[in-house]
């Protein structure tokens, strides 16, 4: 039996599609359905590694958890990871499939369409219900001919569509009506209604606006979801980095400074610290902001050499070394760890047009980028250090193209 589908689209990026999709998944899972999430194509700086070593979007991993199932590459067959200079690495069915710019990517539309439809069909054969998430807005009329992720999928799966709008940004009724007006007649028939997300205040003050809107658009507002400040869900495409910052210096607080770079990736490694009351977390993009914290974190990067050069040019690394000599600890994650060595080499220019760059020299090691990408989940135990007790069991993952020589 082929699964039925329901699709969540939005008036734009960041309106709450991923969380609403997860909530719907959870509802049907709790109601006894065998349900799974799906997103045809994702653009994300952050990714999740499945048990089989495949990369997918973190939102689909979170949604799978809401469904009570393990994340599967079928849930997100295409993942695009921006790497700078208008290029993105293409992850096809969980594995790297080269890099390209937007123009070249659209030339692959026919191939990618087959991949997406095959993945969705396989998922529908395994489950009773598939909750599909769109991307951005279905009203991107300049990109409509290459659509893989919004109304194209809704049409193929004969899926009813709910459109989500974000009232916290302002102008939600204009966003929703504008989106609806730019849809074709056939697409409008698929829309079952709208949801207003992130509402603050008195719902009675919103009621007249909803009534007027429903007089202009022949589709109902199905519900209003309140703004929830403490909802902790991994971000995918961007990060409201300054909202995570807290006042440093309080007694008993661990002051942590994260060095911000233009090509930062998998910043979800750090985001849990923002919700720990014992941590004061700040993001640093200027030397004046770095004042001898307890811990400095160099995060991952989609272009390690060019981010390293950027930090040198901004004299941020010089300040990092000064803080280190004054007692600050340094923690490097992925590309940030590679920066702590002697050299980083990219002889095949897999990430950068620059083939070699000197690191900070804090570790006697050298990094060389290779063609084969390693993605896997791991288990480990910590060794005793100033940061960790010995023997703490941890789960984690590896995503890298590099070999480190020690």
Located regions from the model:
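Glycine-rich nucleophile elbow surrounding the catalytic serine of serine-hydrolase chemistry
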Residues: 338-340
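Conserved phosphate-handling catalytic cores of large alpha/beta enzymes
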Residues: 348-349, 354-356, 371-376
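Catalytic nucleophile serine of serine hydrolases
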Residues: 334
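Flexible phosphate-sensing "switch/lid" loops adjacent to ATP/NTP-binding sites
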Residues: 2-322, 329, 349, 371-372, ...
């Amino acid at each position: 039996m082929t699964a039925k589908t329901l699709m969540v689209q939005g008036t734009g990026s960041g309106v709450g599609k991923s969380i609403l999709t997860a909530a719907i998944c959870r509802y049907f899972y709790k109601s006894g359905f065998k349900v799974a999430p799906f997103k045809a194509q994702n653009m994300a700086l952050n990714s999740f590694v499945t048990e089989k070593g495949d990369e997918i979007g973190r939102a689909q991993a979170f949604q799978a958890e809401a469904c009570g199932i393990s994340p599967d590459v079928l849930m997100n067959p295409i993942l695009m990871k921006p790497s700078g200079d208008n290029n993105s690495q293409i992850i096809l069915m969980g594995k790297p499939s080269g890099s390209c710019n937007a123009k070249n990517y659209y030339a692959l539309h026919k191939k990618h369409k087959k991949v997406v439809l095959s993945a969705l069909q396989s998922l529908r054969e395994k489950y009773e219900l598939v909750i599909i998430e769109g991307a951005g807005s279905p009203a991107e009329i300049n990109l409509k001919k290459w659509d893989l992720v919004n109304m194209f999928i809704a049409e193929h799966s004969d899926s009813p569509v709910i459109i989500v709008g974000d009232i916290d940004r302002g102008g939600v009724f204009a966003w929703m009506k504008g989106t609806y007006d730019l849809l074709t007649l056939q697409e409008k028939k698929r829309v079952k209604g709208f949801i207003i997300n992130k509402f603050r205040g008195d719902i009675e003050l919103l009621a007249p606006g909803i009534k007027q809107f429903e007089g202009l658009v022949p589709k109902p507002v199905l519900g209003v979801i309140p703004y929830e400040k403490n909802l902790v869900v991994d971000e995918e495409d961007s990060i409201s980095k300054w909202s995570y910052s807290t006042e440093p210096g309080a007694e008993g607080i661990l002051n942590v400074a994260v060095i911000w770079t233009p090509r930062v990736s998998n910043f979800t490694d750090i985001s849990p610290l923002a919700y720990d009351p014992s941590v004061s977390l700040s993001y640093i993009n200027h030397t004046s902001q770095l004042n001898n914290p307890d811990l400095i974190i160099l995060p991952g990067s989609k272009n390690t050499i060019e981010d390293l050069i950027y930090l040198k040019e901004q004299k941020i690394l010089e300040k990092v070394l000064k803080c280190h000599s004054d007692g600050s600890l340094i923690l490097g994650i992925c590309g940030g760890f590679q920066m702590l060595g002697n050299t980083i080499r990219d002889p095949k220019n897999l990430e950068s047009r620059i083939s070699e760059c000197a690191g900070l020299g804090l570790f006697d090691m050298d990094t060389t980028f290779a063609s084969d990408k390693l993605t896997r989940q791991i288990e480990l135990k910590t060794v005793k250090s100033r940061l960790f007790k010995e023997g703490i069991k941890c789960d984690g993952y590896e995503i890298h193209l590099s070999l480190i020589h020690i």
